[in-house]
Amino acid sequence: MKKLVLLFFFTLISSSIIAQVQDNVTWSTSPNPFNDSEKIKISVSGLDPSKWSTDDVYLWTWFFDSNDVEVSSQINWNGEWNNSKESMKMTKNSDGTFSFEFTPTELFQYEGIGKIGVLAKAKDGTGDKKTPDYFFEVGRFDLTINSPKINPVILEREGSVNISVSSTNEINYYLMNGDQVLFESLNNKTFSKDILGPDSENDGIKLIESITLRLLCKDINDSNNFINLNFDIVVEPSSIEKEPPFELHDGVNYVNGDDSKIYLQLNAPNKDFIYVLGNFNQYIKSNESLMNVNPLNNKFWIEINDLNENENYWYQYEVFSKSPVSGSPTVVKVADPFSNVIISSYDDTNISLDSYPNLPKFPKNQSGEFTLINQLDKYNWNVLNFEKPKKDDLIIYEILVRDFDNERSFQNLIDRIEYFKNLNINAIELMPLMEFEGNESWGYNSSYHLSLDKFYGTQNKLKEFIDLCHENGIAVILDLALNHVFGRSPLVKMWMDDPDNNSWGGPSNENPYFNQSAKHTYSVGYDFNHQNELTQYYTKRVVEHWINEYKIDGFRWDLTKGFTQNCDENNYDCTNSFQQDRVDLLKSYADYSWSLDPDHYVIFEHLGSDNEEKEWANYRIDEGKGIMMWGKMTSLFNQLSMGFSDNSDISRADHKSRGFNDKRLVAYAESHDEERIMYKNLNFGNSSNSNHDVKNLEIALERMKALGSSLLLIPGPKMIWHFSEMGMENSIFTCEDGSYGGEDCKLSTKPQPQWSDDWTLLNKRKEIYEYWSKIIELKINEPVFEGEYELKVFNQNKLLPTIDIWNDNLSGDTLKYVYVISNFDVTKKSLILDLPISGEWKDLVNNEFIDFSQNSSIELEPGTSLVLGNYLDCGSFDSDGDGIGDVCDDDVDGDGILNTDDNCPNTLAGSTVDLNGCEIFTLPLDNNKVSVTSASCIGNTDGSIGLSIEDASYAYSVTVTGKDD
């Protein structure tokens, strides 16, 4: 049914949806039988809408043509699956039935309807609040098509196609080409006629070119009672083998300096011939629209000419297979799998013109999806060479554009740039933007990975947002779901298993891209076989496109456990264990990303075993690379925020605990896929202390500050989910109306209280935002966080974690030590500080200086944290005149021996010393003085040192250079 086409992902992504299908219903229609131009009344009985928590019932309907092929219409009479149109509301009758009256040709705006599909549903059908599909045949007399069983049908050049129809009534049959009658059979229950190919030696109706023949079937007693059957007969073309003028890549190939011409290439193994149908050729199959075959690689290609650079063009492929595998169609119409923009009969009617102005209308009398050739309005980038933030410094802000602001658009993000800047985050991660099925989605149900989904805005609007982020020092990371696709993908449809011929199905056994059954246990959609060269080529083209076209700074690879061929959909142990094939494969994808952009961020959502994850985290780490790994810490940090010691050990937020050689762990407390911290604080928090009840909103919000300190100040990359910085308490299971709906509403669009209630001005929420902003700024700007650290969790009280941070490479009057301690208990705690040095420490959040000994004791209020920093005072003495106070100088006497190794400190200038810093020879003190007067490029071979030497009678000046020549 149509709902499966539009919102198939709802039934796949959420595995625990509670079924609410009402099976025991009965359908009827009046009159029965009926023609498509008659007004009919459809009724359903045995339905109890109270099981769906509603009193109202809506009809959801779709239709098929006279050849029993489902029609994809650009007219949307139903509305959305989660929001049916009021015009489709059924009437509740006194006998308990529900009914709906309509004229099929008027509702569907289509003539020649052969069958109507119906179901009844709640206005929001999410969670299977519906009845099963039911079908009504259209027509006042019965007809059975005996052959051909498929439509269109291929007519081989020397072959024939038999058109055979039968009825229980005597019928007048007229086989017609347009208005011309080619053959008639009167007063018969059956009709049969052979149609011959152009090279056939038999006599009869011979076709030279492809054509649609119409069989008019009339009631012999009522000429107004008739049915038209259409048969699309495609004459097999003569094959054309021809090399293209230059090497093409799959998809659209533009010609430099010639906007009037493009080349298209499609790789379609096991297909026999392909037509390109578009608005540039009026969608007509002809020799001019037939693709050539490149004899060097067997790929299909075509040259398209006479294009106007100021117009939009679109096309789709009509792909033919003379001998498809059992259950697969002879012909499919698909958009280009390498499309950059799609125009769709399924989704486009519900896309706001505010977000996507000048959206081309879907072409009349066409179906499916088309590739838009968009050469208009090229974007001019302001930032050409963005310097990415260091991996160690990343604070990533994860966003679902749909739920960020009311307009659900890229423009919303642009308008909120000051919000991002003031929070001081330096990276934004956008959940998938690739063309996905439906409009309101998380985006993981992708069908075209190179195509931008139009629901959020135009290509240029996304580029404008990325450009603006780069202008403000913010990197943009894109979530990439490349372990699977969904059913509208051309890569599925060209080789699909479609035994009921309804134009939908999973991969057939000849599909070169997909496994028929998933090779891992977390599969949704259809599982890519990434050991296949075609899949690897497709994946690399996706990576190349988003890096080069959109200047994307990094990818978060979704569900990398799915990149293996070694397991099956039922073996969790296999999926979760080390798999060498995916280790090697994903390294190769990382290598390819780095070949395009050496500083590209590669992030894996693997959530697997340490022995596998460290293979990636440590990969090419000596080159400054290494793959960053998602580190889910939700339940552990949530236990802390709720005030419970059990299962609250956050020591795994330390990259060293996982065997990583450097800081490549993206630890997080919240992500798009987890229950919200604040929701659990308010509903399940520790309420044992009435003076500090975590279920109290003010207290729960206050504790979010400590959570920020304990997570974000751990050195290395970190991630936050949007609006956790203001304590968003809506559950992940919140419905669009703000109610709690369980799994049914996990994927639902969320309300926007952060803007409608202006949270940025509310004291407590503003405090969290400003607090997090301070510690994020500290984390990003202070080089101490690029040093070493120890995350300490004490077995006797896990609610008091500490982070000890230092950087021995720092010198001078700078922040060299940071000490973070938190109290997640619900009572005040007296704590012993384990500071590395005694002296003056600074409260880095409140800007207060405090004197501490190394083992000072402090009292920390419940749900709070203290962030201390030690700035070294280098003193006013500078014995060797190098500009570094003696306290901080590694070589105070300037004899070339570090203080730590100098057994003879304060050696006089002019002395020659041994390895222990003790003098071997010194100029006489009474009449000699040697000093360094200048130095340049210290530590390099082309520097110089100027010396001044004085005695009682003479002054000397010597310059010593280190130049190689």
Q: Which residues does each predicted region cover?
A:
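Short coil/turn motif common to extracellular beta-sandwich-like domains
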Residues: N35-K39, I154-N162, N256-Y263, V932-G946
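Aromatic-rich carbohydrate-binding modules that target alpha-glucans
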Residues: D56-Q109, D179-G204, V255, Y263-E311, ...
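Basic K/R-rich, polyanion-interacting modules in nucleoproteins and related proteins
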Residues: D232-I274, V334-D392
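Substrate-binding/active-site clefts of carbohydrate-active enzymes
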Residues: K361, L376-K551, L559-F578, S588-D597, ...
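Conserved alpha/beta catalytic core and glycan-binding cleft of carbohydrate-active enzymes
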Residues: K551, D584-E729, F733, I780, ...
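C-terminal beta-strand-rich structural cap/linker in extracellular carbohydrate-active enzymes
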Residues: S853-G875
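Extracellular calcium-associated, cysteine-rich motifs in secreted modular proteins
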Residues: C874-L925
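Proline- and Ser/Thr-rich low-complexity, intrinsically disordered segments
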Residues: S879, C888, V892, I920-D965
